[in-house]
UniProtKB/Swiss-Prot annotation:
Cited InterPro entries: Aldolase_TIM (IPR013785), ThiamineP_synth_sf (IPR036206), ThiamineP_synth_TenI (IPR022998), TMP_synthase (IPR034291)
EC number: 2.5.1.3
Organism of derivation: Pseudomonas aeruginosa (strain UCBPP-PA14)
Residues given in the record as 4-amino-2-methyl-5-(diphosphooxymethyl)pyrimidine binding sites: Q36, Y37, R38, D39, K40, N68, T106, K136
Identification of the protein by name: Thiamine-phosphate synthase
Length: 209
């Protein structure tokens, strides 16, 4: 599948109390192309159960599920994987998951990390944070100039993450970003209907003018 559009990322604190599945389905209805399941808890049984449910939803809507920092879970479910800089070897994950799996890599604000990820078999790279982020407030800041440098040198999809809103996403897309990864601006909503509305608005940014 082509990696372009809204990249929705779950947050276990935002999506507690039974909101995970209805809110995720709303995001998928609204056009999210990728969904990253991000849960750092140690409850493996619950994580497996939730990931299986999310995989079913993604299959229903033609989207791709990506698991954060758990190559074994990704391999068990036959889904994609996202690795941070401290989450283990990308090349080892590629060997485990196979050539066809989508594997993304966090590259913060450093082009050399992205080039290394490409060499190790990444499917996409993620730069950020571009704006103030409540999820990762201490992450290194990335600039739009980084995108200008990266676009001609990286021949694979580029993801932007970090405090992105409907107001700031267009400028990043104009600089060549293929995927905008969104957490709070999508899921910090009072209802599933509002999540769907926001997802449709983000997805519309990728449509030809």
């Amino acid at each position: 599948m082509k990696l372009r559009g809204l990249y929705a990322i779950t947050d276990s604190q935002l999506l507690d109390d039974g909101r995970l599945l209805p809110y995720v389905e709303a995001a998928l209805r609204g056009g999210a192309r990728l969904l990253q399941y991000r849960d750092k808890s140690s409850d493996q049984a619950r994580r497996l159960r939730e990931a299986e449910s999310l995989r079913e939803l993604c299959e229903r809507y033609g989207a791709q599920l990506i698991v954060n920092d758990d190559a074994e879970l990704a391999a068990r479910l036959g889904v994609g994987l996202h690795l941070g800089q401290t989450d283990g070897s990308l090349s080892a994950a590629r060997a485990l998951l196979g050539r066809q799996a989508i594997i993304g890599a966090t590259c913060h604000a450093r082009l050399e990390l992205a080039e290394q990820a490409v060499a190790e078999g990444a499917s996409y790279v993620a730069f950020g944070r571009f704006f103030n982020s409540s999820t990762k407030p201490g992450a290194p800041a990335a600039s739009v100039e980084l995108l200008d440098q990266a676009r001609p040198r990286l021949h694979l999809p580029i993801t932007a993450i970090g405090g992105i809103s409907l107001d700031t996403a267009p400028g990043l897309i104009a600089r060549g970003v293929d995927l905008v990864a969104v957490i709070h601006a999508l899921f910090a909503a009072a209802s599933a209907a509002e999540v769907e509305r926001r997802a449709r608005a983000f997805s519309a940014l990728f449509e030809p003018a």
